[in-house]
């Protein structure tokens, strides 16, 4: 296993982390922004108001994107284990 091969595996791993976490992070960002705008408009200063909607929305995103995330993780795991033959 060469240094180039290890760097390739690290790059692929980081790409997968970014791609698989992006739906949850983007949706949480949008929900947080909308709740912040709502709080600014209504002058509500409760810091805990944004947590429950974010948790609910992230759970919904996990339910919706869960099969896709699981499929990508299985493909990545299969690729990593197939690379072990080259060691």
Swiss-Prot record:
Domain of life of the organism encoding this protein: Bacteria
One annotated GO biological process: protein secretion
An annotated GO cellular component: bacterial-type flagellum basal body
Keywords, in A-Z order: Bacterial flagellum, Cell membrane, Membrane, Transmembrane, Transmembrane helix
Localization (cell): Cell membrane; Bacterial flagellum basal body
Topology of the protein relative to the lipid bilayer: Multi-pass membrane protein
Transmembrane segments: 17-37, 50-70
Pfam families: Bac_export_3
Family classification: Belongs to the FliQ/MopD/SpaQ family.
Entry function: Role in flagellar biosynthesis.
Name the UniProt record assigns to this protein: Flagellar biosynthetic protein FliQ
Organism: Borreliella burgdorferi (strain ATCC 35210 / DSM 4680 / CIP 102532 / B31) (Borrelia burgdorferi)
